[in-house]
Amino acid sequence: MVSMKKQFPKLSSSFILAPMAGVTNVAFRMLCREMGAGICYTEFISSDALRKYKDQLGEDNPIFDVVEEERPVVTQIFGEDVDKIFEAAKLIEGKTDIIDLNVGCPAPKVLACGGGSALLTDLDKLKKILIRLNTLSTPISVKIRLGTSESKIVAMDVAKIAQE
């Protein structure tokens, strides 16, 4: 995998607000920043939703609500299609400080569309996604789980792929 040296943002504190669906909207993130969070995560956003609302990025977007005053910020995305994930990430490149690929969510509705921890069952596809994402100028991080079950632990394999 071709790797570029990318700068992760310097944090004002070690407190990090994790992504929480239905909770970490822009108002809550701004409040947490005021209360000392060094960086905040957005709620996770599907690559399909980002692509659907691409013409509204930077305006009153119902999906991507990052504002300059809250930065640094991490935008977490999920999906299952290599090209769609890349296209969605490209839309927010430079508008967020880190793009985090969610490969850990076990929610049935996310698994049903092949996203989240479903990607742990196809490490070749995950590698292709990360190779594409690594061509962007924005730093990439990956949220993972140990595996899909106690007998299928793949965390070290995923970490090696992500490190490449």
Regions found by a protein language model. Give the residues of each.
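Glycine-rich, positively charged N-terminal anion/phosphate-binding segment
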Residues: 2-5, 20-93
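Alpha/beta enzyme core
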Residues: 31-34, 86-115, 123-164
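Gly/Ser/Thr-rich beta-alpha loop segments that engage phosphate groups in nucleotides
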Residues: 20, 24, 81, 106, ...
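Small-residue-rich anion-binding loops in enzyme active sites
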Residues: 14, 19, 159
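Structural preference for beta-strand elements that scaffold enzyme active sites
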Residues: 14-16, 39, 72-76, 98-100, ...
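Glycine- and other small-residue-rich loops at beta-strand/loop junctions that grip anionic moieties
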Residues: 18-21, 77, 118, 122, ...
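Short glycine-enriched loop/turn motifs at secondary-structure junctions
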Residues: 11, 68-71, 112-113
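Extreme N-terminal starter segment of soluble prokaryotic enzymes
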Residues: 5-15
